[in-house]
Each structure stands twice: as C-alpha cells, then as structure tokens.
From Swiss-Prot:
Origin superkingdom: Bacteria
Record-annotated active site: 133, 156
Biological role stated in the UniProt entry: This activity is required for efficient translocation of pre-proteins across the membrane.
Protein known as: Translocation-enhancing protein TepA
Annotated GO biological process: protein transport; proteolysis
Source species of the chain: Halalkalibacterium halodurans (strain ATCC BAA-125 / DSM 18197 / FERM 7344 / JCM 9153 / C-125) (Bacillus halodurans)
Pfam families the record matches: CLP_protease
Keyword Ribonucleoprotein appears in the UniProt entry: no
Swiss-Prot/TrEMBL keywords: Cytoplasm, Hydrolase, Protease, Protein transport, Translocation, Transport
Length: 256
C-alpha cells in the first residue's frame, strides 16, 4: 500500500505548470513587435492618449509589383488605410510623417502624397537620412516640412524598369508622368518649376545618373523644404498648427 501512495505522489509536481501563464503576458509585446514589423506602426499602448499619429515611410516604396523579401519596403496598401483612419478618428488632431526612403514606384508615391495633401488635419513631414526620388512629393505634401541638416534628397528624371517598347508613345507617357511629379512638387512647395527641372536634369552632380543630390540646408535654400530641423521642431510646429485649427473658446467660458 505504501508503494501505491508513492505512485500517486509524482502527480503533484504537475502543479508548477501555473508559471506557463507568464508567456501569455510576454505574448502581448510580441504582438506589438509583429505589428511594427508588418505595418511599420509606432502606436504602442502608452501612446493611445496622444492626439498626434506618426507614420513612417522607409526603405523602398512598393507599387503594384511585390519586391523581393530582402528589400525593406513601405507598402501603399498599408499607408493609405492609416491615413483614412487618422482622418476619421476624432481623437487624432495631427499627423507626423517621418521619411527615410530611397524612392520607389511613382504612382504609389503620388497616391500617398495626394492623400497627405488633401487631409483636413494639420500635417508635418520630417526627412531623416534621405527622402529620395518619389519621396520628394511625399515630403512636400504636408502643411509644413522639415529636413535634418545631414539628410539628402535626390531629384532625378522618371525611369522605367523591365520591358520597354521603343516607340514615341512610350516617351510621351514618360514625359506626362514626369510632369505629374513636377507639377505636384512645385504646387506644394516654394521651388519654381524652372529650378526644379534644372536640378532634375543636371549632369554634373551624380556619377552614374542625371539629377542632383540636395543636402539639408540646400533643400531649404531652393524652397523645396520649409525648414531645417529635427523631431523636436517638427513636434512643436505640429502642435502650433493644431492649436491654430482649434476653434476659439467663447469669452467668459471656464476651461479646465
């Protein structure tokens, strides 16, 4: 009978299985990390009360064709729903867009830029590292734009990849697409069309391409970007724009 009792005792060590509940708590941060990896979202539980939504545009802007997995990309099908949600959410009063992109698909980049430009809420862009190629229209689409002192922006003509049909219509299509980019940039910034095209078709700046590599202060001098600054100035400016958009309170009204 004693042996029978000893056989029952080994079942007791199974009680320490309760600590297995701890990984469930650790699983919450993993969900946030997975969301950041997949969608590039910066929202974490501590920022739920913030009235400013931040969107990052990094790597290569992916178009209708999926890029290789080793490429770090920004997918327009992820960015556009975030912009729509920010526009509809009453708790979000401003939008901060941070760019460090090499460019990418022209139509996808213009789609994002048009969405940003047509938002009713205050928007501010900040170029860190680089805002090259089709990243330029996105950078100038906001109400106010900043660029880091060491950041650069490459301005070059539109290019095609893959099979190209050598007919006059192809070059006409390229010219029209390029005019869309030029028109958008000059409309939403202080740079003139002549100056922008001069930078775009410059032959002595880039080694293996036509165009110009514009550094922080030069981008402001040309009128492409509004101001040189970092995250502090960008947040301060966005807060000012939010306060200006808010309706004034009636005189004599008590505010807490």
């Amino acid at each position: 009978m004693d042996y029978g009792r000893q056989d029952e005792q080994p079942e007791q060590p199974q009680q320490p299985e309760q600590p297995q509940q701890e990984p469930s708590q650790e699983g919450k941060p993993s969900g946030i990390i997975e969301k950041i990896q997949q969608l590039g979202q910066t929202n974490v539980p501590e920022m739920e009360q913030s009235n400013i939504h931040c969107i990052t545009v990094v790597g290569q802007i992916e178009g209708h064709m999926q890029l290789p997995p080793q490429n770090k990309t920004t997918k327009y099908e992820h960015i556009i729903p975030q912009l729509v949600a920010a526009e509809q959410n009453k708790k979000i009063e401003g939008l901060l867009i941070i760019l460090n992109t090499v460019g990418g698909d022209v139509e996808a980049g213009l789609a994002i830029a048009e969405m940003v430009a047509t938002m009713s809420k205050p928007t501010v862009t900040l170029v860190l590292g680089g805002g090259h190629s089709i990243g330029v229209p996105i950078a100038v689409a906001a109400n106010y734009s900043f660029i880091a002192e060491t950041a650069t922006m490459t301005i070059h003509p539109v290019r095609l990849t893959g099979l190209v049909i050598g007919v006059p219509q192809t070059f006409e299509y390229l010219d029209k697409m390029q005019e869309r980019v030029v028109s958008f940039v000059t409309k939403h910034s202080h740079i003139s069309e002549e100056k922008f095209k001069e930078l775009m078709f410059s032959k002595g700046n880039l080694t293996r391409d036509i165009g110009t590599n514009v550094i922080g202060t030069d981008a402001v001098t040309y009128g492409l970007i509004d101001e040189v600054g970092g995250i502090g100035k960008a947040m301060q400016k966005l807060t000012e724009l939010i306060e200006k958009q808010q309706p004034p309170h009636p005189e004599g009204e008590m505010m807490q």
